[in-house]
């Protein structure tokens, strides 16, 4: 059968050139450098000069011919043109093509097709299309008859149609088509072409794959990446920061799409400190000497600030010149500064034993504006030089203060008379502590004038009779010379007519007095400068005429009282021993069960029952927790992880009830029976509680997997993280309201005789209305060791949250409602500090030691005094003296009703720089006299002052103020602070038996 004329292959002769016009050069969309897709060729017939020798079926179908391309290079092509015969099925198969691990292959076809209408006398079966197929194999296994020449096993890619066909008189028009197929999984593949009645030439076939070229973007390097199996696939390419760059967000990756183009960058790098961007974000160049860059980022290097330099590249900070420094609070871009020069023009004005110093500002402030002054006092001996001078005593007083002065004037008093002093006025600023040299100063030498002695501190009564008083006193603290004698003034209180007596000793006997009369006595010392001031009035009383008999009885009274007391103690001891023995015999077998049950019986009172007292713990679950059908539960998302598994948010829709959000705790796969029991014990505990400030149990799922506990959903999650997220956003009343809710929940638990053991802000949940609810029941005892989380520390076989736990619970595992009160005080501190970590970065052992030494947390910033006092009440060492939760609720209610009481703010500031408060509290009830108490706090020197001023009882001492201390002669600020602090503790002990007052 004669064939129609097929489209001729390209060849050099001019007559045939019109059949193969030059290929149309389509414009390419230029991609940025480094972002253009790469194409790797697997097979290209354009470069084959020998026979292709592809397999055709039947042999009368496709025919291999030679030709030339547009550059006159010889090429091998295939053509077919059996258009005059119907039902054509001509197949052509390439050789085996190795896949090279790519998943998707592209095929570029260049061909010409003759227009069927241009061929005369052909049947209607003439076509202008052909089909493209492929067949996968692990090796070159194809033969002339295998695989079968049909669509299955061959996989069809597409039917290829030309954009343009040509007629007999037209020049051949070359069509270019690109198709792709995948995913591929075997070692290689064959391409196959099916002709069903077309007149065409297959000029060239190219099989290739695409990949994204290696690129640099956003200071990160991304490697060459093969495209995915589908045209829409996005293949992740992990990136690495370029040299001298650091990650600023992770993960660092770029997506390679099916066209071999990069898109969707995730994460980023930026230039590290000491480096600046260069070459369009493809380099991070070191800062040259003389410049620096303190922060990572895309900013440029900056010239060094004044008085600083760099000697090497890539500097993140410029070092200061010699004798120039930066303070710790100065930023890296701050200029280096130096210490100030000495103050100028120091003027002294001496008045007896006091002094006023004034001076002018230094000539050079060192380039800073934080100038302060210190005044150093040195007392000099003899006529020697500076080596004969030593620091002044602590009783020298500086007003307004000695160190850190902002004023250029200071008043100095309580100096010794006739004494030579040297005063150094130092100028310091923020970098003085950085300098190895001492601060610069201006010195002035002065000599104090003659001065009278200071006041005699105290008077003591040695003995009294019906007509005499024997008295003694301590010398003045500042005699200001040699004491010549003492003058005593005394008078009967009812008459007021004074008499005087002189003594060269510091004691005297007053005779000729009336019996049973009260006398007022004062004494003063005299030197060559004259008399000093009289001491404060002291009152003493003579005895009556019957005093001798009474005195004898008084001498025997201790013996009588001691004997009676010893007898009473013996009787009580015998009775106690007998009672203890009887109780041990009667209740010995039941004590362990009773303590474990943690309940007491009261008419009409619901009590907590420990689920671990059940022989079968599952019985407790059935009794206290409602079983929920798993079909009613829908888990939406995982919101966290717990000790036993994941914590999820979900919905609960029970028949006849509206759908509600719930929190779902799940038990992880592979649990043991003990883990299941421990997990469900929380539900057994929670199911016994019904209070608006206790997390509500919705039910449990135990009849399917996973096992679940469902509770009400709290939108704002844990209180500590919620407060940190909203730092400073709430009023004090709102915070107190949160504390009141927590206290109300704990009051309910304590009334049910339940001890929480792990009360902390992390275990308080907050809903959308800021209602706080106590949660996490019973799980802390099962926590596993986690060295990375020091919150819980092993102690006596269990896990204890040291920072929140009372001392007796840490030492003896003695958990009670009183230990929960201690933990509640820590929660108060967490709330008022907006979620700060208690005791900051102190180790657990340091916390234990500090609490044992009676140190307590200071008030958080802007914390009302009343709230911090309530915290301190919760942290009293003796658990019996801590307030009950009912008292705490009443106190907070009063504070909320009386908002003005919350405006008194504690002066201490929260933070790492604030030391713990020393709360050493001597028990005043163990002291017989006020003097014993003063000795205990190492203030015994003031015993006579207290007694002579009339402060002889603890009730009176508890009412003393700072003015009272000044009046009785306690003038040193440190001593005043120590005594007042102990008085405050004394008041606390006196009030512990009563509800906390507001």
Swiss-Prot record:
Protein modification: Phosphorylated. Autophosphorylates upon ligand-binding. Autophosphorylation on Tyr-614 is required for interaction with SH2 domain-containing proteins. Ubiquitinated by RNF186, mainly through 'Lys-48' and 'Lys-63'-linked polyubiquitin chains.
Phosphotyrosine, modified sites: 614
Any one GO cellular component localisation term in the record: cytosol
Domain SAM: 925-989
Disulfide bonds: 81-199
Domain of life, per lineage: Eukaryota
Residue ranges, Extracellular side: 34-559
Residues the entry annotates as binding ATP: 639-647, 665
Residue ranges annotated for the Protein kinase domain, each copy included: 633-896
UniProt-annotated catalytic positions: 758 (proton acceptor)
The protein's Enzyme Commission number: 2.7.10.1
Family note: Belongs to the protein kinase superfamily. Tyr protein kinase family. Ephrin receptor subfamily.
Protein function: Receptor tyrosine kinase which binds promiscuously transmembrane ephrin-B family ligands residing on adjacent cells, leading to contact-dependent bidirectional signaling into neighboring cells. The signaling pathway downstream of the receptor is referred to as forward signaling while the signaling pathway downstream of the ephrin ligand is referred to as reverse signaling. Generally has an overlapping and redundant function with EPHB2.
Protein name according to UniProt: Ephrin type-B receptor 3
